[in-house]
Structure formats: structure tokens, C-alpha cells
Amino acid sequence: MSQTVSGRDKYVDWLRALSLIVVVVWHWAFTILQWTPQGPSATSPLGFTSGLWILTWLFQVLPLFFYVGGHVHLMSWQRACERGVGIGAFVWRRIRALAAPALVLSGVWIGIGAAVTWAFDVAWMWRVVVLVLSPLWFLGVYLVLIALLPIALWMHRRFDVLALIWLGGAALVVDVLRFRYGFEWAGWLNMIIVWGLAHQSGFFYRRIVALPRRYDVGLLWTGLFALIGLVYSGIYPGSMVGVPGEKLSNMAPPTFVIVALLVFQIGLVEVLRPSMERLLERPRWKRVNDTINRFALPLFLFHTTGMAIALGLTWWLFGSIGGRIPPDLTWWLERPIAIVGPLLCTLPVIYLFGRPRKAA
């Protein structure tokens, strides 16, 4: 296991930061914003490009983020125990560190929304605020899981791997209630059950790392075959992200398919581990890893703010911000610009209001 001098697992740091950056780049590159009489409306090329949904099996990385987060929380708690820190203080410190910047950002945008609506009498400004803040939903789930950490740790000590089996079974039961018996409200229980399962799986990270390589390959193929079977059962959509216009999403709320995706991604990152650990030992890659870990969370928090600024400048300079539907060749060729533009607008926001931080 590749570690820094301080004992950190560099591959864990890489996975956690990379998962946030993948989310950011996906939002920048694959959001098609249309202006309607009611205000801005976002859609995606997934609804117009046949077969593109298969990419979401690799780039929907939230299961991996929660998995790595579970491992980090367990390791951090063990270090806190050695210092004599109580579980209440530990949980509160982590909630405060994550919630404070998110709440400040939300407050600023709500204030901007109220001011613009009052000054210019434009109701659409609230749609802008919702679009900018909507990616923060998963931080809310993450905060709930941190608050539930005492229960999760107790389950891990008391029941070990049975906790994962029970959570997986509960996620499947929720889908049965939802799709077989029509209890749509039950699906929202999976916001905690499915993401809680991913987080709980992270407690087994070191055991998974210690397994022989054939088990890594087994996890990868088990997850992949489960994904194929579930998607082609006709019950679940193929995309691992929401697609505008489809009546069912695997993400809102999450379905049992996300459990299969989690298994697939755990297997994949373990299969890639030897190569990536060798790469992360190189001085240049060490610097890259350190840099993205310092900036990943601020970049995630402010990336939609930067995108809003970039779109505002585009409207000011060119008089239009609407993306083409369906996306054509020109739209695809513009994707590098769609990434670089918001990035250049986000970096000053991070410099002014964000605080690059090291992963805890």
C-alpha cells in the first residue's frame, strides 16, 4: 500500500480528489443550458445521444466517493481515539468543517437571488440559484452519514460484514416496495440505505486491499455482470445519472443498481491499484496528487458559481447562452471550451473565498 511519510494512503487521496473532479468536469462538459420563458433549464446530451449512457458506469463516481469517505472516517476516528477525542466531538468537528463553507455558499446565493429578484422583479433568478446549489445535495447526504457515524461504527464492531448484507437487502426491499407495490415514497429511504452501504463498505477497505488479486477481478466482474443483468431486466434504466425526460432515474432516489455499480467500481480501482501506486510514486505525480487534494473540495463547492459567471459573460459578450438541442458536431468540438471557461472563472472565486485544504 503506497503511503506518504505521515502514513496516508496516497491512492485513497487520489481516488477521493479525482471523484470530486470527475463530477465537476462532467457538470461543465455535459450540461446543456436552455433559456425558457420561466428561466434557465438544464438538460444533458444523454437524452439525445444513443449509447452515451454506458460512460456513466465509469464516470458516475459518487459510490466510490462514499466508499473512500467511509475508510477515511474510520481511520480518522481511530487516530482521534488515540488522542482521547470522544465520538461526539469527532463527529461535530467533521460536520462543522464540511457544513460551514457549504452553508456560507448557500447563504450568499440565496442573498443574491433575493436581491436580484427584488431589484429587477425577475422570478427566474430563483431557478438560477437552484441550479447553482443543486450539486450540493450529496454533501447533505454525506453530512447525515457523518452524523450517523456512531451507529455505523457500532454496526461494524457488532455485525462486521453482516451489516453490508443487511443494507444491501434493505436497498433491494425498498426497490420491491417501489416498483412492485407502487410505494414511490419508499424510494427515498435509499438515499440513506444505498449511500450508507457505500460508506459502510469503506470500513472494509484495508481488508479488500489485502485480498489476493483474483478477488479484485472477481469483484469487478461480479459488479459488471450485476449491472448488465439489472439494466437489461427492463426494470432499471442504463444510465447511472438522471436523464431529463426519462420517468425513472437510478440516482433520484438511488436504486439497487447503484449497489452493483459500487461493487464494480471497487473491483476496478483495486485492479488498477498496482499501476496507479507506481505512478503516484513519481515526483511529478506526487505533486499533482497533492495539488488536486488541496483544491478538490473548493473546486467542487464553487464550480457551479464559476459556471454561472462564465455563462453570464457569454450572454454579455454574445447575447445568448443557450446550448444546441440536440447536440451537434460543433457542440462536441466545443467541450474543451466548456471546461476551460468555467475553470478560469472558478479559480478567482476559490482564491477570493475558498481555502485550499489538505484531505483530512
Ranges and model annotations:
Residues S2-A360:
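Alpha-helical transmembrane segments and their immediate juxtamembrane cytosolic regions
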